[in-house]
Amino acid sequence: MGNVLAASSPAPPAAGSPPAPGLVSVPPGFTMPPVAGLTPTPDKKETQEDRLPNPGTFEECHRKCKELFPIQMEGVKLTVNKGLSNYFQVNHTVSLSMIGESNYHFGATYVGTKQLGPAEAFPVLVGDLDNSGSLNAQIIHQVTSNVRSKIALQTQQSKFVNWQLDTEYRGEDFTAAVTLGNPDILVGSGILVAHYLQSITPSLALGGELVYHRRPGEEGTVMSLAGRYTAPNWTATLTLGQAGAHATYYHKANDQLQVGVEFEASTRMQDTSVSFGYQLDLPKANLLFKGSVDSNWIVGATLEKKLPPLPLTLAMGAFLNHKKNKFQCGFGLTIG
């Protein structure tokens, strides 16, 4: 929910996980007592452990469960990644399909020198251009320690199709975000999305989403409320709104096995569905297996196999729709 563009592009890794508290020998505001036997005063300052964590973003509420489900594959796909420097990388992707159109994509990623963590550096520029001239591009930058902004553009051949501007503010125990999509002052159209997520306790986070859209002859607002409870090895999330309901449950059985259940109900489509997915990770064998089955009797599975010391990753996927008696499979190879 809240995604204005249909274009997909990689997002920065681990952007939604809350920062771990720093390890300090003495809590902030305290000094070592000069002699033994002294006890802290009742009006001591709040320690790092007493503070509520940042809950992440609203869009990441269901992500942990949805990442367990396999991505549908069809045809043959070859991807070649090449790092030109520590900051710049390009990739070439060729897809051959029996159902859709075969295509070629050229992608480029630039990561700046503003290091904020082991896996985060800004600004980030991501672009993808296909053989028809259509472009998907994103620019992500950490303006301050709390404010992050993103600009996304999508063109179809020589015409602008979509563009959006995101601004996100992360406080100590809350995250607020505003997205403006396809604004047109002359026509009087556009989409405005506002998100807010607040940590109530270390385990419970509550928030909401407000979507306002306007175009000639049509104007409307859709509101949704969300709650997420996080335990040491499971997470439950529920979103309720005028558009329907969305609930997910994620459970980590052990270091190798993770399972998830997803429920979706749409008031517009008058349809409900339940999906079950799991992920099996075997690091010693360099294998990653994902499987799923839903209430529409669609069964799918993907298998990824890394071939060290070569920079190769093999991927195979198969999906069977029992109701429509339709089967499709795919094979992928990633180099680099």
Curated annotation (Swiss-Prot):
Keywords: Ion transport, Membrane, Mitochondrion, Mitochondrion outer membrane, Porin, Protein transport, Transmembrane, Transmembrane beta strand, Transport. Residues 42-52 have a biased composition (Basic and acidic residues). InterPro entries: Porin_dom_sf, Porin_Euk/Tom40, Tom40. Residues 1-58 are annotated as: Disordered. The keyword Repressor does not apply. It comes from the Eukaryota. It is a multi-pass membrane protein. Transmembrane segments: none annotated. GO terms for cellular component: mitochondrial outer membrane; pore complex. It holds the Pfam family Porin_3. It is found in: Mitochondrion outer membrane. GO terms for molecular function: porin activity; protein transmembrane transporter activity. One of its GO terms (biological process) is protein targeting to mitochondrion. Residues 10-21 have a biased composition (Pro residues). Channel-forming protein essential for import of protein precursors into mitochondria. Forms part of the preprotein translocase complex of the outer mitochondrial membrane (TOM complex). Interacts with mitochondrial targeting sequences. Belongs to the Tom40 family. This is Mitochondrial import receptor subunit TOM40 homolog. It comes from Xenopus tropicalis (Western clawed frog).
